[in-house]
């Protein structure tokens, strides 16, 4: 057998990581706290985790919250695993799953999540790609029922057109907008902001970061 490419090696290491990677996550729908985290802490998820800098730092700074990193691509999630395995302390409040966001209802029950982060997800700028945008009406209506009452969706992007599109979708659907800005670092949310790797790179080059927050104000 020839040597596996590094990407495949990373994926295999991720899949074999019983400490952080959750295989067959649909088995735990409605049972994440009971069977996986074994506590009653709030659960926050990041959809489109990428290299995982954001959720890694969130988990490191908030031990009383359970975090789940979600991405479609295992190879990318392996980079988060590297961070977790090289951390000087073992984090028990973070797990990794690899699924397509459109199947998220198979993984979580209604009102199971406290917060959903959408950080610098692909804007899919072409009109005929709108169906792939994670802030279109299909996805937002998919995400909101997973939230507890008053749970939040937090969305950040450096793409102004994508931000304006997402803002329009929220308003057209009469979602409860609690915060919106075209300059995050000049806002009240700047103090508690945790950057992604992408965000740090482009904000250092002078790009403004846009953010909006949607609240689930409908009781389940």
Swiss-Prot record:
Any single Pfam family the record assigns to this protein: Methyltransf_4
Chain positions recorded as S-adenosyl-L-methionine binding sites: 46, 71, 100, 122
Binding site for substrate: 126, 158, 196-199
Listed pathway(s): tRNA modification; N(7)-methylguanine-tRNA biosynthesis
Keywords on record: Methyltransferase, S-adenosyl-L-methionine, Transferase, tRNA processing
UniProt superkingdom: Bacteria
EC number: 2.1.1.33
Role played: Catalyzes the formation of N(7)-methylguanine at position 46 (m7G46) in tRNA.
Name of the protein this chain belongs to: tRNA (guanine-N(7)-)-methyltransferase
Taxon lineage: Bacteria, Bacillati, Mycoplasmatota, Mycoplasmoidales, Mycoplasmoidaceae
């Amino acid at each position: 057998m020839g040597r596996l490419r590094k990407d495949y090696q990373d994926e295999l290491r991720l899949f074999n990581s019983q400490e952080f990677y959750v295989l067959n996550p649909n088995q735990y729908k409605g049972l994440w706290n009971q069977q996986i985290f074994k506590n009653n802490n709030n659960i926050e998820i990041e959809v489109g985790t990428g290299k995982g800098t954001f959720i890694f730092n969130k988990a490191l700074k908030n031990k009383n919250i359970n975090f789940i990193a979600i991405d479609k691509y295992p190879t990318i999630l392996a980079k988060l695993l590297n961070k977790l395995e090289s951390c000087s302390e073992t984090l028990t409040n973070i797990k990794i799953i690899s699924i397509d966001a459109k199947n998220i209802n198979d993984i979580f029950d209604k009102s199971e999540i406290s917060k959903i982060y959408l950080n610098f997800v692909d804007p899919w700028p072409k009109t005929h790609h709108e169906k792939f945008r994670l802030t279109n009406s299909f996805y937002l209506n998919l995400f909101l029922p997973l939230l507890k009452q008053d749970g939040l969706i937090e969305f950040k992007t450096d793409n102004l057109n994508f931000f304006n599109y997402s803002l329009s979708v929220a308003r057209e659907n009469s979602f409860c907008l609690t915060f919106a800005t075209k300059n995050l670092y000049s806002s009240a949310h700047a103090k508690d902001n945790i950057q992604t790797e992408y965000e740090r790179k482009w904000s250092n080059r002078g790009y403004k970061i846009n953010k909006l927050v949607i609240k689930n104000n409908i009781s389940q």
